[in-house]
């Protein structure tokens, strides 16, 4: 994946970058209840997980700071596009990882996601090839409506954002689910986390609009 090197000494966040880089646990994590009522009404038979994943990936890519990664030499790379590496459950209850590369339209994304999931389930091993540094690491816990999630991080230089979501519930006519975003605080702040959730709302609204205008179910 193509990336641009960011000169953090000239970046507006140069002070914050240096400050959080020195920490043993430089990560920030937020969980927000996201309203998916309109999406669920318009979804029809379209796959829920891949539909939400599509919106999440587009929202995360819309925030440049979430596409930034720490390189082994200490420099910061900003990728043009970051793909998801996400969990897929096998029949035995053990998960493997799948990826969907490229900035694809919705139907292409779903088709590629279904193809990749079939491949990784047949292969059965945990990991797959790809540029791990560029990925968003995504997982879901569809059995649990939680209030917060904490992700394992390999070391203080682990800069791949983690995105998780839990079980959706309906109350008072609205359907919501918890969505968690974990970032490296040297690369992103609360402003950028907030922008992700704003973009996610916009992407879900746009996807819902497209579905409502479409004359075909999936």
Language-model-derived ranges and their functions:
Residues 1-23, 79-89, 151:
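Short amphipathic alpha-helices and their capping loops
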Residues 39-64, 177-196:
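Acyl activation and transfer enzymes in specialized metabolism, enriched
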Residues 3-6, 21-51, 66-82, 136-138, ...:
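Gly/Ser/Thr-rich phosphate-binding loops and adjoining beta-strand/alpha-helix segments
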Residues 203-216:
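Flexible helix-coil linker/hinge segments at domain or subdomain boundaries
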Residues 66-99, 125-134, 218:
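Small-residue-rich loop/turn and linker elements
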Residues 90-146:
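Helical lid/core segments from catalytic subdomains that handle acyl or acyl-like groups
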Residues 28-44, 93-107, 188:
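Acyl-group handling in specialized metabolite and lipid biosynthesis
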Residues 130-143, 161-200:
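Histidine-centered acyl-transfer/condensation active-site motif
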